[in-house]
Amino acid sequence: MKKQNNKLPYKKVRIIWQDICSSSQWYDDLTDVDEFNFSWCEDIGYLYEKTSKKITIFSSYSYDGNKLSIGNVSCYPACVVKKIIYEKQ
């Protein structure tokens, strides 16, 4: 089977974003609550869309002839994305 030489028309990116953390446990020592914080997260994928409200990436793709299919799509509220780093392809 011959490999297609289709060039992906999307840039590879690393998304740095903030996520909530929650805990269902009870705290007797409130200093533990004072130290409770959100999480910093990173995802790598291809930038599908960036608007003032959302950023959408995907991390899997396939070509069937010239038809592109994508998978593993993630959509982030723009307010939680703190940095977009464009990776070398």
Descriptions of predicted regions:
Residues K2-Q89:
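Conserved RNA-binding domains used in RNP assembly and mRNA/RNA metabolism
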